[in-house]
Amino acid sequence: MKSPILVCADAESLSRRAAKRVLAALVGKPGLLLCAAAGSTPLRTYQLLARQRERHRNAFRKLRVVKLDEWGGLPLGGLGTCEQQLEKHLLGPLGVSGKRYLGFHSNPSDPEQECARIRRCLVSEGPIDLCVLGLGMNGHVAMNEPAPSLQPQAHVARLASLTLLHPMLADSKLKPTFGLTLGMAEILASREVLLLVSGANKREPLRKLMRHEITTEFPASFLWLHSNWTLLCDRAAAEGLNTE
């Protein structure tokens, strides 16, 4: 399966294109279920979406959001959590109320039961209409890490040492002890997927993705099995690559 690959001039143009696509999907389907990744790459996209709230208030009024993943063992909404970032840049600015938001608690008393709750809610609320993803340095998608096998549904994840170096955690005194993440089958069940890849530091994982080799040791490669996904990357990430 060949993916539509769009190479943008820079991170700003990538974010503008991504925001335009998310907005079009939202206007086309009020009540859309958006799966939102945290991290630095999608933040500008969310900021640009927030600028459109007044103009498209009716569409945003019914928007539903599911959090893609979360760092386990950190206080909910604490420094470095996905919850904190999404609340600041997406949920708050877009006026997404608690009734229209589904997210892992970062420090549940029973992580397995928390994942079971998310699985049940996603069955009830899903499938995901549009999933916004980033590309991990080791090829992880959400917190689905390279492994001999991948989990299909929401689960407790063992985090790779490279993942624990994520910039989101740089200012957090506490470090996560596990991950909470949607599974690959839930991600691939999305009606549409946007993969955002920005920066020269993502050049190597993008090169591996473009091999078109599907392997559990590089979870992002499973996106090649999806019939409606788009790779948006900037020139810094795509430099020297054959994106055919």
Where are these predicted regions, by residue range?
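Ligand-binding beta-strand-loop-alpha-helix segment within the catalytic cores
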Residues: 1-2, 58-132
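N-terminal glycine-/serine-/threonine-rich phosphate-binding loop
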Residues: 1-34
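Glycine-rich N-terminal segment of FAD-binding domains in flavoprotein oxidoreductases
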Residues: 28-55
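Glycine-rich beta-strand-to-loop/alpha-helix junction loops that act as flexible
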Residues: 36-41, 133-137, 198
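A glycine- and small-aliphatic-rich helix-loop capping segment at beta-alpha/alpha-beta transitions
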Residues: 48-59, 84, 146-156, 214
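A short secondary-structure junction signal
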Residues: 113-115, 142-147, 152-154, 205-209, ...
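Class I SAM-dependent methyltransferase SAM-binding "motif I" and its flanking Rossmann-like core
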Residues: 138-184
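ATP/nucleoside-binding phosphotransfer catalytic cores, i.e., glycine-rich phosphate-binding loops
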Residues: 185, 189-244
